[in-house]
Amino acid sequence: MNALDPDTLIHPDVATAIIHGRHGDPFSVLGIHTTREGVVLRSFQPEATSVVAINPESGQEIATLHRVHGDGIFAARLPGRTGYRLKIVTATGTDIIDDPYVFPNLLGDLDVYLLAEGRHEDLGRVLGAHVTTMHSPDGREVEGVRFAVWAPNATRASVIGSFNHWDGRCHPMRKRVEAGVWELFIPGLTAGTIYKYELLGPNGELLPLKADPVAWYAEIPPATASIVASPAPFQWTDEQWMQQRGRLQAADQPISIYEVHPTSWMPAKCGDWNTLADRLIPYVQSLGFTHVEFLPVMEHPFGGSWGYQPLGQFAPMARLGTPESFASLVNRLHEVGIGVILDWVPAHFPTDAHGLARFDGTALYEHEDPREGYHYDWNTYIYNLGRNEVRAFLISSAVHWLTYFHADALRVDAVASMLYRDYSRKHGEWIPNMYGGRENLESVSFLQHLSTVVKSRAPGAVLIAEESTAWPGVTRPAHEGGLGFDYKWNMGWMHDTLHYMQEDPVNRSWHHDQMTFGLVYAFSEKFVLPLSHDEVVHGKRSLLGRMPGDEWQRFANLRAYYGFMWTHPGKKLLFMGGEIAQEQEWSEGHGTDWYLLDRPNHQGVQRLVADLNMLYRAEPALYRKDCAWDGFSWLVIDDRTQSVFAYMRYGADSDAPVLVVCNLTPVPRHDYRIGVPQGGYWREILNTDAGIYGGSNTGNGGGRMADATPSHHHPASLQLTLPPLATIILKPES
């Protein structure tokens, strides 16, 4: 064949576009094509010295491709539309490959339709990189990796990696115009392949290389590339847990959460997900927590963000290992009956050039106007939740963690910043909604849709809101006009009660209402009481460090506070280190001071937390009616002079009631009369002043007999000794 055969020549402009990586439709040029004179095969191989089409079975030559352009375009006429492979000789050796440009469309019609509509709920399955097997035009099964990325305004998209010397000209992708998605199947690639996307913007400008927004696996920072994840499905053995998690996470069940930053919990001994599981799981079991909540495990470039500036919304952070080892951690927690909550950040994302920022040369994931699209507090971009494709991206991320990784709940971060357009903004720095108000209607719609999708796609999973304002109906169902969350962090309770506990006891009478005000609204939502990581950072000091007095009083205050918290309506959350009375505040580089457990006072607090969890789970009155007024009644609410609080907790009619009394001064109170609903013997089932916890062992000798003296609107009453800076808990013997 003549090398200058006009049938195989490419128009000079087309050749230039291919060679310079500026052609937006490579499938119209490369691969096999039928012309008026016959079948033509074209291939772009810039490093090749020769290219031969060979029979896939026998390896015999079908045709030699001739160089029709000096910079790497080869072409030949074939005898017909036959199957072939390419034998490529370069200066470094010979490779035999399947041609990526002979495979048909990869995404199905329904996926493309849902992508175009912005209504796809499982983008983790459709976009990104997936090891798969495709059928070649001649019917052979060809293994490789399917890539797909949403970049509607890009004029060219390519997959790059060491397999093509990071040359964006070698593997340009096909654009599915109707959905704005670029796709390509590259034969021969396998799990573990490191890759990025090279994009040209709307004006043909070369953009910063991009990590895959939907990658399931990524390099360890500061490296920024994505990695093709293993195709083998994880072998889950948590069926029993998954079937019952909906019941175990209901509002009438005990939920006690241990919040963990995975890389700093025990960094010297837990360097990966597997060793973390080895130590964390028995520890959490021994303390009696029902759930572990992880600060964001999604891949994030800056460790100092604690995960709250994620870019890999589908990838567990590689700092601790593979996606499979993270799945194993979840599975092992489930096997021993411990639920897994993941912090999840749909409010904003970092500005790193390799991430989502101006992904295709336009404000694709973010708003164009910084008054809507930039968060000045965190120097991050805000997701454009008015764009259906962005909503679908985040919805799919949530579904991904709850289904593929079996997470039981997502704690949605920074909800308040999503709900208000003027959140942390000065006058002139925000744009009102369509009605002139400050409410972010797009975010409201997104959160309602999120709750609806989660309930249908992940039965039994729950959503928890970190929401710090008085927005009504956060935990009301979406179909009733609420946001649809299952629980909400009670930030007001946390701020008020911590402020009270920080006061010297001599001043507490002036702040008495801070301990009682939370009950005014305690049943307006379904609440979690959070003593989270946010309360032990940035100069706030540790929980122990906030307590006033000498060493004995500081520990006693903390123990009494925990007793108050564990008996107060609402689910419980404690950040790691709180259970051992950490002395220093936390940072991601400091972690937990486990050496403190060599000291009796710290051992005592740890034992108290374990006993509180055990008691909480054993007494239905402490959880059955967490979200209902008839599960709680004040007995002593107004003794501000002595800083005493007393209340009853009730469960179902068949559940024994529980009496809680807090004395938050260092002065013991003797013969303190408190009314109770029935006579008989009331056993003291927990006393935070017990000697085993480091207290003074002041108490009631195991219990008290109620007499017939009416008090506090009850027919009987107890005369109790109230230990100093302590909470005592009693229940009727029969």
Curated annotation (Swiss-Prot):
Catalytic activity, EC: 2.4.1.18
GO terms classed as biological process: glycogen biosynthetic process
Keywords per UniProt: Carbohydrate metabolism, Glycogen biosynthesis, Glycogen metabolism, Glycosyltransferase, Transferase
Highest taxon listed in the record's lineage: Bacteria
SUPFAM superfamilies: (Trans)glycosidases, E set domains, Glycosyl hydrolase domain
GO MF annotation, one: 1,4-alpha-glucan branching enzyme activity
Active site: D413, E466
CDD domains, alphabetized: AmyAc_Glg_BE (cd11322), E_set_GBE_prok_N (cd02855)
UniProt key word Glycosyltransferase: yes
Pfam families hit by this protein: Alpha-amylase, Alpha-amylase_C, CBM_48, GlgB_N
Pathway terms, separated by semicolons: Glycan biosynthesis; glycogen biosynthesis
UniProt family annotation: Belongs to the glycosyl hydrolase 13 family. GlgB subfamily.
Protein name, entry field: 1,4-alpha-glucan branching enzyme GlgB
Organism (species): Granulibacter bethesdensis (strain ATCC BAA-1260 / CGDNIH1)
Lineage: Bacteria, Pseudomonadati, Pseudomonadota, Alphaproteobacteria, Acetobacterales
Gene behind the chain: glgB
